[in-house]
């Protein structure tokens, strides 16, 4: 099915077109949902919420950019709005002490273990870490997305890195 035709049918609330859109893109958007969620159940809920938003806003898509990129942006925004609404993002005080980086020492950890550790981070740290490290957003962009200051974004990132570093060190100690 041609993309323009698919979008037109989705705007008209054609269920078969919506189902086709879901089958075609769900696996890609699910990966994004996993990055921002604590577990698979929450990721699935976020995926469904994202598709509901996509179906509602699909008529607003302008063919100026990538349709897939537009859907990814909708997905991230839907998840962030959910966390803001549920008050997952309690701001840290602005005078939060910045964390000092430990001397760099490479630590080996499997990708699955690292992803598990990222999912275990408190929401505000996980969201900031994902947006900055995995998605390449600046602290200014993150602060706009999350409704915080750039200082809070930097503090949350530093704290996320510290927590991850400690989890990796503890794993290494437990294995030895």
Region spans (language model):
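C-terminal edge and immediately downstream basic/flexible tail or linker adjoining helix-turn-helix-like DNA-binding
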Residues: 5, 9, 144-147, 161-176
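A short, charge-rich alpha-helical start-of-domain segment used by transcription regulators
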Residues: 7-29
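Sigma70-family region 2
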Residues: 11, 48-66, 85-86
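Amphipathic, Lys/Arg- and hydrophobic-enriched alpha-helical face
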Residues: 22-40, 57, 118, 167-170
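Structural recognition of an alpha-helix C-terminal capping motif at a helix-to-coil junction
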Residues: 31, 45-52, 65-77
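Arg/Lys-rich amphipathic alpha helix in sigma70-family domain 2
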Residues: 59-63, 73-93, 159
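Internal acidic/polar
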Residues: 81, 85-112, 116, 138
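A short pre-motif secondary-structure segment
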Residues: 128-132
């Amino acid at each position: 099915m041609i993309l323009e035709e698919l979008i037109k049918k989705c705007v008209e609330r054609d269920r078969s077109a919506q189902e086709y859109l879901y089958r075609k893109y769900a696996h890609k958007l699910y990966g994004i949902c996993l990055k921002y969620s604590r577990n698979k159940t929450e990721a699935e809920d976020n995926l469904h919420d994202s598709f509901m938003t996509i179906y509602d806003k699909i008529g607003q898509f302008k063919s100026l950019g990538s349709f897939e990129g537009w859907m990814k942006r909708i997905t991230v925004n839907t998840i962030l709005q959910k966390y803001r609404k549920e008050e997952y993002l309690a701001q840290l005080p602005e005078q939060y002490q910045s964390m000092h980086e430990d001397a760099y020492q490479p630590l080996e950890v499997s990708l699955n273990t690292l992803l598990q550790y990222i999912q275990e981070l408190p929401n505000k740290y996980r969201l900031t870490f994902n947006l900055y490290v995995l998605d390449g957003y600046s602290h200014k962009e993150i602060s706009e997305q999350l409704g915080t200051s750039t200082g809070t974004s930097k503090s949350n990132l530093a704290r996320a890195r510290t927590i991850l570093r400690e989890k990796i060190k503890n794993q290494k100690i437990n294995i030895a």
